[in-house]
Amino acid sequence: LSPGSGITLWAVFSKCDDDVDVINPIRLGGSALGKKGIRAEEVGENAAKEIDKNIKSGSSVDSYLADNLIPLLALYGGKIKTDKITNHIRSNIYVCEKFLDVKFEIDEEKNIIFTI
């Protein structure tokens, strides 16, 4: 809990400018948590900066969603591109590789995670 305000922003869009791909949309988020003495407007600006950074990264999912998708990738295969590779993503990969018969590769330059 926080004594200040908090905000979460979501963007759902497609690579195509004409229409949203409802089967494979791109979902990115941005959030910020305030604290005592921080104006709500500043908290909102911080969340907007985060979602803008995620959109400009060209990723298909943000790092918060990416770490939750790791177990699904382990079970069904595939690949995702995220804005950054976090320690939580690495931890999820490590655990999945220990429990399941799966191996992951990470393209550190492009922030792409995939099963092999």
PLM regions and their residue ranges:
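Core subunits and conserved enzymes of cellular information-processing
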Residues: 1-116
